[in-house]
Structure formats: C-alpha cells, structure tokens
C-alpha cells in the first residue's frame, strides 16, 4: 500500500475511529475500523512462547483447548548459546507460533541489561554485556519478523529492576546510558529493523519512559530513525499530553476501563478543545497503518503460521543443547560413567518451569531432567529419585489477576522463610536424610538445585543470592554422602555457589531451557552432547561484590543511583581485579581447544583479525572464540576489557580452522559526554582473544594516534 493510500484512509476516519486505534480495546488488542477494512491489532506476551488465551476484559484464562504452544528457552538460555543461528531459530519458532495463534505483535524480546543478580526479570533478558545482547537480539528479531509477525523489543529503557518499577527514577549518566543501556535497542532498530518497541515503566530524567521525549523523540526517532510503532508497557502511561506529544503510538493497560485510558476519551477531549492538534493522532494512526501494511494485514496475502510442530520442537532441543554451561569438571567426572543405579536428587529434577509473570505460557509438554535421564537410559540403569527439598509454603504471586494488582505497587520481595512449624522442620530434615542416603548408596548422583518462578518472576526482585528452601544444607549433606555428586543448577540469574563450588567436582548450569530442556540436560550429562554454552553474565562470590550493590544502589528508593556508571558486571570485576566465582563468557567442554597464530590487519573500516583454533581432544565440540578490546587509558578511564566480537566454531577431533573476525572502529570508542558523540581517543589498545574474559589466550596491541587517519571520530 502506498503512503498516499494510507493518508487517504486516515482522512476518511472520524476522530473516534482514530482514538480506537491508538489504545487498548481489550487486554491484548486495539480496535479496528471495519468499514474501511482495517482490522484490530492483536498482541501477546511471548518471551518463552505465545501466552495462553485470556478473557477480553480481564486476566482470567479463556479455558480453551487450542492454545497449547511450544515452550521456548528463556532469553538468558538463548544468550548462553553464544550462537546467532540459535537465536534466529528461536525467533522463527516464536514468529510462526504467534501467527498460528492469530497474533500480529509478539511482545519480545526483552533486552534490558542485567545490572544486578537480584532483578526478577533477568531470565527474560540476555546479558550484562551490550555487545552480546545486540548480537543475539538482532537475529532473534529478524527470525520473528520473517513470519509476518512484528517483534516488540522491550523495555525501552533502563528497566533493570522490578522493585517500585512503575515509578522509580533510573539515575544514570549519559556515558553509561550510551555505552551500556542503549546499544541493544539501537541494534534492534538499525540492524534488526524491529517494527515495534515497548516503553518501560520507570522514569528517566523526570519523565516516564513510555512518554519520555528524550528517549522516544530525540534518540529513538531522531537519532536512530525509527519509523515503527511505540507501544506502552501495560499501565505505563501517566500523562495524556506527554503521551500525545512525545512519540507514543499505542497505550495498553491492565484494567478494563479502556475508554478512560490517557489516550482514549481524555485525549479525544483535549483534541476537541484544541489543546492537542489532531495531526498528532494522524501521525500515530499512520505509524500503525504502515505496520499493518508491512505485516500484510491490509492486503490479505499473509503467512498463516503454525504451532507445536515437530520442526519447532527439534529447533528448541538444538537450542537447549547449546545453552547448557559446564562450569566445572574436575577429574573428568562428566560425562557420567555407565552404572547400575543413578541417584537423581532435588525438586528441580522433576519441576516444570514454563511460567513466570508475563512469560507464563500453556506448554504442550515439558521434559524435566528426571524424565530426560529415564528416556535416555531406558531400562539399563535404575534411575532413583529423592526430592531432597520442597518448595511448598513460599509466598506466590502467580495468580490470575496479578498483573492488574501489580499497579498497586505491592511491597513483595521474592524470599523464602518456610512455614516454621515443627512438622515442616521435621519433614525438611527427613527429605535431606533420604537424599543423602540415596546418594551414598549409588555410585553416580546428580543433585538438581537452583531457583524457580517464585524467584525468577516479573513484579518482584530477590532479596539475596542465596538458594531458597534450605538447599545449602541439602547440598552439604549430599556431598558428604557422595563426593562425586554432580551439581546441576537451574536459574535465570546468578546464585550464590560458595557453599559447594569448591567441594563439588562437577557443576552444570542451565537457565529455563524450554520444553526439551530436560532431555538436553540428560544428553549433556551422559555425553551424548558435548556442552558448548557460555555464561552471559558473571557469577560473583558475594552479592556485595556486585557493583550495583557496592558502588551504586539496588533497589534504592524513589530514585536509584547508577553510580557505577560504565563499570557493570565483568567491566567492574576485571578493572578492579576482583575475584569472582565464574567469570563472564566461561564454559567448559568435554574436549580441549588450543589457540595460535593471531594476526591483525589495519584497514580503512577497522581492524581485521584471524586466529587459528584447534580441537586437541578426542571428541567433536564447539568453541566460542571471544574477542575483547582494552584501552591503556592514557587519556580516558576505560574498563579493562570489553567484549567486541565472538565466533562459535564446530570442530572435529584434531581439526584446525582459521577463525576470522572484524573490529570496526567503533569497537575502540567511548562516549564523550562533552562532545555528545562516540570517539576513538589516541591510546594503545589490546586485542584479546580467548575462551572467556578471564581466560585470554592471545593478545596483540594496536596503536591509534590522534592524527591517525583511522582514529579520531568513530565511524
């Protein structure tokens, strides 16, 4: 449809019809204009799969039987693969399933930076590093939108905590904003070509992000040239005038008084009174019609989509296999050796995780690790289970109306206290004794511990990094009983591992890994799959070591000071040389890789490099070659190292391959707040290649001078 035809449609609309298109007329849809052939715009939550069907005017399920969908790995799990192909695959699955369910916009991916281990929505996000976020988000977005479904990248911007999320002021300096918190969104717009974007709940520099002039008008539309649709977070609009003037296109909320939304009757009244020009509404409607045209909603020629197909399940399994991170494997404990009896311990071995706030879905099925091990081992091995702990009794916010109630700013924190009764304490100790006895009686034991969606959950943050439900006591007892016990951690955020990290000989980490996650875990534990996942965040030794807690504020009060500036995650730990439990980018394999022959070449558009990687072991495996840049800091204080590239390469035993990479000049830049631009200062830069930020194998230096034709202002 030409732009002329779109404007012709707008001229035919009444004020009321325009208003109907720019705010929710149901919990997850706007109103169309039937007489002009304009349909409603249907949306759905979707980070881990298309959400179950809800009532039109409340959050209760419809109770239909045709809304079972595929359960995808969380964004944190996708990021653990460090593989752009897997991100693209998950985007394709999500886009196809959204179309199959009749949705136009899928509210994903979430790409906010992980600032603190305690944020309840970390599992929905990707990483503490903006480059990894950008590189994984772009193919995911493209995969979604190839299916005639619009991605809705969220939450723009600085939604880094759930505590007081509706009104908290994120106080961050411009350099940190530009270097850390915005690059993922910029990549989503410029490279991913996302068609829609969701504003955040929080405030930034005095204005709520859903109608923040600086973020939406100056940066998003002005600097980045975004020409898509901006959608509010549900209940994130607070001012009719700002919403009209500052770049918001669609207001959604959690309540059913649709005509009372800021961009409904109140906006219509302001237009009729002359306070707001109708041309502002026309621009919003134009953006929505352009979106509909791009999705082929107006011409009838559109992909139909599908859900719960075998192809989707196979793609999810492949992603889940690559998302598992081997943290420790002392003495080659893994893969598990053939035995007659295998002890499987821990509630997370048999727990299903397809949920967590707006990530909750209605999964067709979910394979737990216990199921996966039994499937893989068949009748040859007796797989014996002991729960070890139980999560009964914790406070839950997973209820039908939790989202509507979330606007009441409940002072709820995710923490575990237990019910404290004598009977409960007796039962807890019985579970530990039973688990320890089982571990002692079996040659092999795997203990599944970690979090669940009572702790990794929208609407609340954790109070600490400790494992809930008395798991630390369980771990100690099981390791006392069997020192060869493998610890398998399931969590969407870093957890405190100090009680077992030195004692356990083998530790495996997995985020919420989708409907095939349990099978993928079994395959890795048994050696059917060689693990190749890497951590997308740092696991610190103590919460107080984290920069958001030691330098900045978390969760703060009405305002949260990001005093740590650009020193977030490994940027802080590496610069301050602070020891961590497991560093950013860490992940082991069942084989060994060697690095050599690093060569760098200076060209007009950046530094080009090549490095030789060899599989020195006896099994095939995949290696993630990570490239970091560090400045000597002669003129500007910079983090010690920053991720600027990565390549995942699959190698057969004995195979050697040259891995190529490119570092554009912006990879060497920082944001100059005085000049309000990125620039490359004169300095000596280290190009570091290795397996993680803490395991650098090769280093070469690059000198960039002030008058160097290749230096100066970033390109």
Where are these regions (language model features)?
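Glycoside hydrolase catalytic-domain context in secreted enzymes
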Residues: 1-673, 679-694, 701-703, 710-715
